[in-house]
Design a protein with these regions (language model features):
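Topogenic membrane-insertion module of multi-pass membrane proteins
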Residues: 1-49, 168-188
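Cytosolic, membrane-interface loops and tails of multi-pass inner-membrane proteins
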Residues: 47-63, 110-126
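Lipid-exposed faces of alpha-helical membrane segments in multi-pass integral membrane proteins
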Residues: 11-20, 37-40, 75-78, 97-104, ...
Length: 188
């Protein structure tokens, strides 16, 4: 079989399946279910790299991990939020398509940049250029929660937030990468 199936990529695969469940939830009109899946995908993405770093991997396994993570991110943090917003406001189709395109470009840029970075150093990444697409796992759930709390309309504010977020994906400002201390995780 093509691909890699060790524990270093399993959480990425799980995150993708959770994201796909979120797309189905959004298409079925279950906004809360879609938001919860978006958050679940975000949790999987938060830890998949840390888990992968615990294993000595071949260069092919490392490159596969980068690619599969970005493909999963496109579905979970590009397509899922776009479907979620489109379901709440069907007049936002072009905006949602543009958001997915911006997420795709941002992820492709990251992959090229990460490959070049890894050719020069094995140090951990300290910053990103442009807003990482994974921030969608925080932005849209917070927006949804605020709208529930203040009884506002997700269908009105979500497209505006989506436009700003998509623009931030491609704007070359620097974002410091949060680092959490890795305790009790040994290399295998």
């Amino acid at each position: 079989m093509l691909g890699f199936y060790n524990y270093t990529v399993i959480l990425t695969y799980i995150g993708l399946l959770v994201g796909f469940g979120g797309i189905l939830s959004a298409m079925g009109g279950n906004t809360l279910g879609a938001i919860l899946c978006l958050m679940g995908s975000g949790l999987c993405d938060m830890f998949d790299g840390k888990i992968a770093a615990t294993m000595e991997r071949t260069p092919s396994e490392k490159q596969f991990g980068i690619q599969i993570d970005s493909l999963s991110d496109l579905v979970c943090f590009g397509v899922l939020p776009a479907v979620l917003v489109y379901q709440s406001n069907e007049h936002s189709a072009w905006l949602c398509g543009g958001y997915v395109l911006c997420a795709l470009i941002r992820l492709a840029w990251f992959n090229v940049d990460e490959q070049a970075r890894q050719e020069h150093t094995q140090e951990r990444r300290r910053e990103y250029r442009g807003l990482p697409v994974t921030t969608a796992a925080l932005i849209f759930p917070v927006l949804f929660g605020l709208e529930q709390f203040f009884s506002l309309s997700f269908s009105v504010s979500a497209p505006v937030v989506m436009l700003v977020t998509a623009s931030a994906f491609l704007t070359p400002f620097r974002v410091k990468k949060p680092h959490f201390e890795r305790r009790n995780m040994k290399r295998l």
